Curated annotation (Swiss-Prot):
Species whose genome carries this gene: Streptomyces clavuligerus
InterPro entries linked to this entry: FAD/NAD-bd_sf (IPR036188), FAD/NAD-binding_dom (IPR023753), Ferredoxin-NADP_redctase_2 (IPR050097), Pyr_nucl-diS_OxRdtase_2_AS (IPR008255), Thioredox_Rdtase (IPR005982)
Keyword NADP in record: yes
Lineage per the UniProt record: Bacteria, Bacillati, Actinomycetota, Actinomycetes, Kitasatosporales
Pfam families: Pyr_redox_2 (PF07992)
Molecular function per GO: thioredoxin-disulfide reductase (NADPH) activity
Superkingdom of origin organism: Bacteria
Catalyzed reactions: [thioredoxin]-dithiol + NADP(+) = [thioredoxin]-disulfide + NADPH + H(+)
Protein name per the record: Thioredoxin reductase
């Protein structure tokens, strides 16, 4: 059993790094698979984080993740920027296979794989990705200087994308299916006050135009069905996220929206020794601070599980011969 670790954490972000910090401080020597592309989670694509406690003037998303990562590493967490391609979580010893085919074994697993950007599901959406269609304003905004840009969505992310893009763009049109926004009042006020931002209410993108690059959109009125053309060279999609749970289907229980189920208020899944935290579980709050909180809870749940497991193993050991 010498090659069996105490705990493996699949995923990063606030939940994964907090779980890594707590399990590392408990001397559990966690192995963390951060993800080859998604290391750090969604906050790596966020500009100012103004609502994470402890930072009076805010902090850049990547800086916050770098700080969390370094803190976990300081206490002994082993962090690997690699993907997990398969898992077997059903036995007492869990197996996790990385992209190189190496199999890692652990007594407990914490899942913090987060969520991914949701697509509109339209023809040309994927073909024009990187050619005018994007899901990340902080990544691609600079390339749209003095251009007409469209942002789709009505939540905080859409407002943040729009206000960030207004620094570069000639104009930003926010396309939203309804006649009011879901975003927080602070984010709404910021968008409404920006002279470069306008709104296309009760509208959805019906068609994406362009061969080699985006040239425009067809918008459809969600109430009347009428369509109109809108010239744009940039389309930023911010319509929500889907949980990254494909890896766990058939083993861990999922809800109707594909999120992992846990025995709330704990982070226990349906499989003994497997815990889940962050946006892979939460489709209600979806905040960095709540993800970090559940990452802490998952680490404590895993620590207590391992302690109970060690106690039971000691009890099961035969008494020495007299």
């Amino acid at each position: 059993m010498s090659d069996v670790r105490n705990v493996i954490i699949i995923g990063s972000g606030p939940a994964g790094y907090t779980a890594a910090l707590y399990t590392a401080r408990a001397s559990l020597q966690p192995l963390v698979f951060e993800g080859a592309v998604t290391a750090g989670g969604a906050l790596m694509n966020t500009t100012d984080v103004e609502n994470f406690p402890g930072f009076r003037d805010g902090i850049m998303g990547p800086d916050l993740m770098d700080n969390m990562r370094a803190q976990a590493e300081r206490f002994g967490a082993e962090l690997i920027p690699d993907d997990v391609v398969s898992v077997d979580l059903t036995g007492d010893i869990k197996t996790v296979t990385d992209s190189a085919g190496t199999v890692h074994r652990a007594k407990a697993v914490i899942v913090t794989t987060g969520s991914q950007h949701r697509k509109l599901g339209l023809p040309r959406e994927d073909a024009l990705s990187g050619r005018g269609v994007s899901w990340c304003a902080t990544c691609d905004g600079f390339f749209f200087k003095d251009q007409d840009i469209v942002v789709v969505g009505g939540g905080d992310t859409a407002m943040e994308e729009a206000t960030f893009l207004s620094r570069f763009a000639k104009s930003v049109t926010i396309v939203h299916r309804r006649d009011s926004l879901r975003a927080s009042k602070a984010m709404q006020d910021r968008a409404f006050a920006d002279p470069k931002i306008s709104f296309a209410w009760n509208s959805e993108v019906a068609t994406i135009h362009g061969e080699q690059k985006l040239t425009g959109l067809t918008l459809r009125d969600t109430k009347t069905g009428e369509t109109r053309e809108l010239a744009a060279t940039g389309l930023f999609i911010a319509v929500g996220h889907d949980p990254r749970t494909e890896l766990f289907k058939g083993q861990l229980d999922l809800d109707d929206e594909g999120y992992l189920k846990v025995a709330s208020p704990s982070t226990r899944t349906n499989l003994t020794g497997v815990f889940a935290a962050g946006d892979v579980v939460d489709h209600t709050y979806r905040q960095a601070i709540t993800a970090a909180g559940t990452g802490c809870s998952a680490a404590l749940d895993a620590e207590r599980y391992l302690a109970a497991l060690a106690d039971s193993e000691q009890i099961a050991e035969p008494a020495p011969a007299v």
